[in-house]
């Protein structure tokens, strides 16, 4: 078995630390609720590093990642938002690679890992990156590092 390529400086060196904390916020499907959520985070100095919004008839599910999960969590609690948390991985997309998403999906397919959902990062020090929620984060990170990808850690998020 080949040795794992260590993550770049700043990227998390342990696979568990390489996961990012994602907040899954349930919003009523009403005008202004998203603005209220973003304003609450802004008032405590939290920048949104990644966001995905799924709408249904009565509610919206907002998935987001901020630079400081502890501060973000407390903000959501204080503002009365209903939310849950999950761990995801973020993978840097090399600028010199014409088809990084194809390489990522093929690498994970080779280990029979399912990607449940994905969305882009808005703010990341290393450049373009994608958030992945997969069956096994540790195995996915190991495989992607072997294939030359960088796993984004908390220190790679844009500052608060």
Residues covered by each model-derived region:
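A conserved regulatory-domain signal marking ACT and ACT-like small-molecule sensing domains
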Residues: 1-160
């Amino acid at each position: 078995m080949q040795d794992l390529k260590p993550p770049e400086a700043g990227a998390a060196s342990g696979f568990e630390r390489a996961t990012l904390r994602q907040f899954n916020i349930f919003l009523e499907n009403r005008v202004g609720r998203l603005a209220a959520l973003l304003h609450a985070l802004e008032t405590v100095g939290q920048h949104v590093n990644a966001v995905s919004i799924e709408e249904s008839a009565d509610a919206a599910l907002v998935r987001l990642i901020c630079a400081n999960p502890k501060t973000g969590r407390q903000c959501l609690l204080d503002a009365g938002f209903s939310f849950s948390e999950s761990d995801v991985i973020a993978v840097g997309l090399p600028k010199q690679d014409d088809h990084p998403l194809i390489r990522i999906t093929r690498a994970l397919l080779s280990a029979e890992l399912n990607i449940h959902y994905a969305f882009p990062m808005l703010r990341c020090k290393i450049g373009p990156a994608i958030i992945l929620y997969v069956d096994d984060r540790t195995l996915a990170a190991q495989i992607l590092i072997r294939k030359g990808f960088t796993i984004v850690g908390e220190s790679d998020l844009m500052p608060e």
